[in-house]
Amino acid sequence: MKYTVESLRQFGIQVAEKAGMSHQDAETLLKNLLFSDMRGVRYHGMTRLSGYVTRIERGCTSATAQPTITMDSGAVFSMDGNNGMGSTIGTAAMQACIRRAKEYGVSFCTVNHASHYGFGGFYAM
């Protein structure tokens, strides 16, 4: 059976929202999963959705956690993911790095206490 990317995106967003994620965070998660699938990296794509939901349901991962900065030296900083979804925490870290790189010329961030962040190439492309 074949599905369109859009139908998978909509389905995945509904599943993630039902698990407790905000619409915006669910969209971020699905962008990451589908980005991976569309590049042939299936083991980091939609196949992971059920596992992510299970971890939320079991209380292993927070569907709503937002990162906090725990160390800040300007261009270099650390974030605590507060046990949140890796895709949303990873996206927040990358966006913060981009903002800081514009200011400092370069930026580096470490993240701890977050779940699997998915397909790494998603953040670089």
Regions found by a protein language model. Give the residues of each.
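Aromatic/hydrophobic pocket-lining residues that form π-stacking "cages" and hydrophobic walls in ligand
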Residues: 12, 97, 122-123
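Active-site cofactor/substrate anionic-group-binding motifs, chiefly glycine-
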Residues: 45-100
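Short, conserved beta-strand segments within well-ordered enzyme catalytic domains
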Residues: 34, 42, 77-80, 107-110
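Short, well-structured alpha-helical segments
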Residues: 23-34
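Generic N-terminal amphipathic, Lys/Arg-enriched alpha-helix
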Residues: 1-19
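Glycine-rich phosphate/diphosphate-binding loops that line cofactor/substrate pockets in enzymes
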Residues: 26-28, 98-103
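Glycine-rich anion/phosphate-binding loop at the beta-strand->alpha-helix junction
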Residues: 30, 106-125
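N-terminal and secondary-structure boundary signal
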Residues: 17-20, 35-42
